[in-house]
């Protein structure tokens, strides 16, 4: 059985982003600022977000800044203390599968 890989703020850019909640906090396109939702797909240059609106939103990674919510396990008291991480979109500019492979290299040498 494979163990679940923990997502840490310091390694978020190397992980699968699909399923994470996200908010656009900075963009060269002012209409995108404040958009929230869940990442449902990703390409080299775009994050595709599902929100409460009627359609999927395609957000360019370049020249944007995102706030990701990393869910945590419930504590013994039944509380969550989710972590929020700001990421410059330019750090995500690569094909997702190549970015994810890089974490394996980090673990090998780290």
UniProtKB/Swiss-Prot annotation:
<comment type="subunit">
    <text>Consists of a catalytic RNA component and at least 4-5 protein subunits.</text>
</comment>
<comment type="similarity">
    <text>Belongs to the eukaryotic/archaeal RNase P protein component 1 family.</text>
</comment>
<dbReference type="InterPro" id="IPR002730">
    <property type="entry name" value="Rpp29/RNP1"/>
</dbReference>
<keyword id="KW-0378">Hydrolase</keyword>
<keyword id="KW-0819">tRNA processing</keyword>
<dbReference type="Pfam" id="PF01868">
    <property type="entry name" value="RNase_P-MRP_p29"/>
</dbReference>
<dbReference type="InterPro" id="IPR023534">
    <property type="entry name" value="Rof/RNase_P-like"/>
</dbReference>
<comment type="function">
    <text>Part of ribonuclease P, a protein complex that generates mature tRNA molecules by cleaving their 5'-ends.</text>
</comment>
<keyword id="KW-0963">Cytoplasm</keyword>
<dbReference type="GO" id="GO:0001682">
    <property type="term" value="P:tRNA 5'-leader removal"/>
</dbReference>
<dbReference type="GO" id="GO:0005737">
    <property type="term" value="C:cytoplasm"/>
</dbReference>
<dbReference type="GO" id="GO:0030677">
    <property type="term" value="C:ribonuclease P complex"/>
</dbReference>
<dbReference type="GO" id="GO:0003723">
    <property type="term" value="F:RNA binding"/>
</dbReference>
<keyword id="KW-0540">Nuclease</keyword>
<protein>
    <recommendedName>
        <fullName>Ribonuclease P protein component 1</fullName>
        <ecNumber>3.1.26.5</ecNumber>
    </recommendedName>
</protein>
<dbReference type="InterPro" id="IPR023538">
    <property type="entry name" value="RNP1"/>
</dbReference>
<keyword id="KW-0255">Endonuclease</keyword>
<dbReference type="InterPro" id="IPR036980">
    <property type="entry name" value="RNase_P/MRP_Rpp29_sf"/>
</dbReference>
<dbReference type="GO" id="GO:0004526">
    <property type="term" value="F:ribonuclease P activity"/>
</dbReference>
């Amino acid at each position: 059985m494979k163990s679940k890989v923990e997502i840490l703020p310091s390694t978020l850019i190397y992980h699968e982003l699909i399923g994470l909640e996200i908010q656009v906090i900075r963009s060269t396109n002012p209409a995108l600022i404040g958009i929230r939702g869940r990442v449902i797909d990703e390409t080299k240059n775009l994050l595709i977000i599902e929100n409460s609106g009627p359609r999927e939103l395609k957000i360019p990674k370049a020249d944007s800044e995102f706030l990701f919510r990393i869910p945590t396990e419930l504590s013994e008291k039944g509380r969550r203390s989710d972590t929020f991480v700001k990421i410059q979109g330019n750090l995500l500019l690569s094909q997702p599968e190549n970015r994810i492979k890089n974490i394996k290299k980090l673990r090998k040498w780290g």
